[in-house]
């Protein structure tokens, strides 16, 4: 009789331990984690506003802009009245700019930077590109981001987001 009670408690304990281990395994495997980008590798930036591109690019291009003179050759200021109407001022003593420019298009185009990540010897610029219906006019989609000058010597690689 004593052995039979001990046996049933022992079996019950094994079942509970197995159930606990299985539950812990399932809970740990259900969590989704984005470990691809380490927090220390993210490069902060500010998106520059109220500029227009001067020129006609025939293919997508990334331009690194390191001086006010280069900025003035590539972009004009598009100020307007009201809040937020001034073009973003860029201090080229502390920062540089990265411009991503697409060719002219008559399709509705939304282009926006998503992230800038430091990899071993380059910066990865991830962006979102959505194109819609044809319009009756042409635009030249682009964005400009302002980055700390300590990253100026890194090459830049663009990565389109497929969200």
Predicted regions and their residues:
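Bacterial Sec-dependent N-terminal signal peptides
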Residues: 1-37
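Exposed, flexible binding/inhibitory loops of compact, secreted disulfide-stabilized domains
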Residues: 30-163
């Amino acid at each position: 009789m004593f052995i039979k009670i001990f046996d049933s408690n022992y079996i019950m304990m094994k079942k509970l331990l197995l159930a606990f281990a299985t539950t812990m395994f399932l809970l740990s495997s259900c969590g989704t984690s984005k470990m691809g980008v380490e927090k220390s590798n993210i490069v902060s930036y500010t998106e520059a506003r109220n500029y227009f591109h001067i020129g006609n690019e025939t293919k997508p291009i990334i331009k690194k802009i390191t001086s006010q003179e280069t900025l003035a050759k590539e972009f004009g200021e598009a100020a307007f009245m009201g809040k937020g109407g001034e073009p973003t001022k860029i201090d080229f003593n502390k920062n540089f700019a990265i411009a991503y420019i697409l060719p002219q298009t008559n399709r509705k185009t939304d282009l926006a930077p998503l992230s800038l990540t430091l990899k071993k010897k380059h910066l990865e610029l991830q962006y979102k590109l959505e194109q819609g219906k044809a319009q009756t006019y042409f635009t030249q989609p682009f964005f400009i981001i302002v980055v700390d000058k300590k990253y100026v010597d890194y090459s830049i690689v663009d990565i389109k987001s497929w969200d």
